[in-house]
């Protein structure tokens, strides 16, 4: 089967119109790499967008007014995200003096503010640094006396908007039998915690298998499990793969660690398969977010999936082809699955394939 035929076949298998709109938008992003157009689509598609990076800050500063430092592409994206979330933007700032000439004094309808004026007249406002290389601007702001507590640095210089309840949106907890949850790529344990909340507490699940190979994340996971009082967790400190092995691993500690090669990796890790760990046992729900190893992990879970048809929530954004290759493989494992696709953020990350 050719690639185009496979892409169209997966499109036809998607079970609702939202899934098809997401599929089309992601395909266009893969082909054209137009992040701004994708952002515009996301904002038009979803009306419940929130900005998680600002939520903790706004608990302490409920009337925050924002100034964007950086009028390039990231600043333009940040402006659209803030407005879609209902935030108050009062101006923008940039070190490029040419942007302040004549008609360019206004950016996206907001006034331009000279960098030197921030510390003098705007120290009660909040500056969001909206450039990739944020450290020099942060240092510039601190040196001019701008309060550190009113400076927000977005991850990778890109403010992120999101919506929905990722991994759980399309599923209802089965109250007739207890859930058995597999969290492959549990990072900080928060998804496991969300699962417990979703299913209604420890009376409604039998067991949780949590896989995480990144040693720098183990303490976070265990702390999350302990604070939330999560019981019956089998914490597997290994990566998921199609078999038991030892592989090169590139660790970040930020939820984006991944299998690498000898040249790029900074350590070696043990990996195993879901079928090996469950050893013929049941799973009712499998979540996979394993930074590009989703297909190998599915191959290593094929017996569990064939035998028990668990609910599946699979990340399909780490590799462009995963969106159709993973869907095709899931259909081969169990043709009775109904497939849905959802996207959760204003960037290309966090596209989830659901199989029910």
Predicted segments with their positions:
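Phosphate/nucleotide-binding beta-alpha loop and adjacent structural elements of enzyme active sites
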Residues: 1-65, 69, 73-90, 95-356
